[in-house]
Every structure is written in C-alpha cells, then in structure tokens.
Design a protein with these regions (language model features):
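RNA-contacting regions in translation and RNA-metabolism proteins
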Residues: 1-192
Length: 192
C-alpha cells in the first residue's frame, strides 16, 4: 500500500527467502567513507544551523515580551553597560538606562523592563531599562493586588529615576482609597 516502506511478497522473497508478510526487512546501506575535511564541513554546517535556530527561538520568545519585567543575573560589565543573563538569552542594560549612582557587580540579581528586541546579524539584541516610566507602573502592578485585579487603574507615571516618582491612580470602587491601597501600611508597598 505504501511504496516507500512496503514491498510485495515476491520482491521480499528475492531479498530474503524466509520473508513472511508483515515482517520487517533490513536493507543494509553501503558504507560511506567521508574524508576528514568533508566530515568537518558537515559538522560546521550543522552547528551553524543549530545556532540560527537558537537565535530565531530567542527572538520569537522575547519579541512578544516587550513591556514585561524580567529578572536576571549580571554576567559582565562592558564600558559601563551591563550584560544580563536572562537564563536562555543575554540582554543589554545600557548605562543611560540605569538609575544614576546605581552600581552592579557580577552575579547581582537585576530586575528590569524589556524595552526593545531587535533582530540583528549577530543575533537578537534584547535591550532592558530601569529608568523607563512603565517600569515603575509594572512594578506597581506586581506589588499592588488591587491594580492587578483592575479595581485601581494607573493613569500616568512621572519619575526622576533614583530620587522620586509620581503615579496618578484612580479607583473604580468608591469604597477603596486608591492612594492608600498603593502606599500600603506605613508605606510597605511603596518601599517594596
């Protein structure tokens, strides 16, 4: 029925006189003798294709996550720019996207906002920010359950990174004080 994997009984009997219907026949392939250079070239092509597939996967995974907050570890610092290991990818936290007077060491945990993901020749480039106004908004969404549930909405964010920030909030439930819910008991939510 399927000519690529099945043959008729007569052909099978010419190859193996003991063949029975429903049985598997093994057709040995002639040995292929690749030279050292050909084997090395094949290996390089395979490794290159795997790298390309990995880059495509990284780009596909992170392009949909623009605007999210990610956690990572500081891998190294190059010319003031911080290279952050996100687990399955590396991201760049440029010096101008860091909070002033903020200092990182190798191995430090970093929480940052995915600002941009670009497809470039040397692979996808993920750019992070700790000064973006939406970074503060996303942190509040994580920290304040009322914002996460949609009872309180963030209307606007203005900040001077490293010193102060102002967030305009509105409550759609008259019984909930939006500022009090965001500040928390003795400022516990703001301090977090």
């Amino acid at each position: 029925e399927n000519e690529t994997i099945q043959i008729d009984l007569e052909t099978a009997l010419t190859k193996d006189p003991d063949a029975v219907p429903g049985e598997f026949l093994i057709d040995p392939l002639p040995p292929i003798d690749f030279g050292r250079i050909a084997a090395q070239t094949a290996k390089q092509v395979i490794v290159q294709k795997v790298r390309e597939a990995e880059r495509t996967r990284q780009y596909g995974e992170y392009k949909d996550r623009i605007g999210e907050i990610v956690n990572g570890l500081v891998k190294r610092i190059e010319y003031g720019n911080v290279i952050v290991d996100l687990g399955r990818a590396e991201a760049h936290l440029r010096r101008d996207e860091c909070i002033p007077r903020e200092h990182f060491n190798n191995g430090d945990r970093v929480r940052a906002y995915i600002m941009d993901v670009r497809e470039e020749t040397r692979g996808p480039q993920i750019f992070l920010s700790r000064t973006h106004p939406q970074f503060m908004a996303k942190l509040f969404i994580q920290e304040v359950p009322e914002i996460y549930d949609g009872v309180i909405e963030i209307k606007a964010v203005a900040r001077d990174p490293g010193s102060r920030a102002k967030i305009a909030v509105i409550s759609y439930d008259g019984s909930i004080d939006p500022v009090g819910a965001c500040v928390g008991m003795r400022g516990s939510r703001v301090q977090a």
